[in-house]
Amino acid sequence: MATFLHTMVRITDPERSRSFYEALGFRFSREMDIVRSGVLEATNYFFSIGDQENVLELTYNHDGRSYKLGTGYGHIALGVADLDGTLAALKDAHGIEPERPPYQVGSGGTRICFMRDPDDYRIELIERSGG
């Protein structure tokens, strides 16, 4: 049986992305340079959250190429205990606003909202009922 290991997204500014994901509670774990034929091609930055190790990999390619998000990409979903507090912290630290205000889904009190990370990847924040 397979186990989930990590999600990788390409980034354009390692420091900006690191600061953003740390504001969401991720911990920087390690970085790994990818060198081929003596040329530094990419640096992978790994992040952990809670007791889950190295679940997010941010890849910076050193050749300066740009990327377009594919049409098949949806979003990364993250659970938060305090949706309003998380949004306030992201606004203060990064000027990030949700796509629309948080809203309730279903009848159980769960609230969600969507936002974009510094490289325009869509992030869903989920506050389950009861915090």
PLM regions: where:
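GNAT/GCN5-related N-acetyltransferase fold signature
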Residues: 47, 115, 125-128
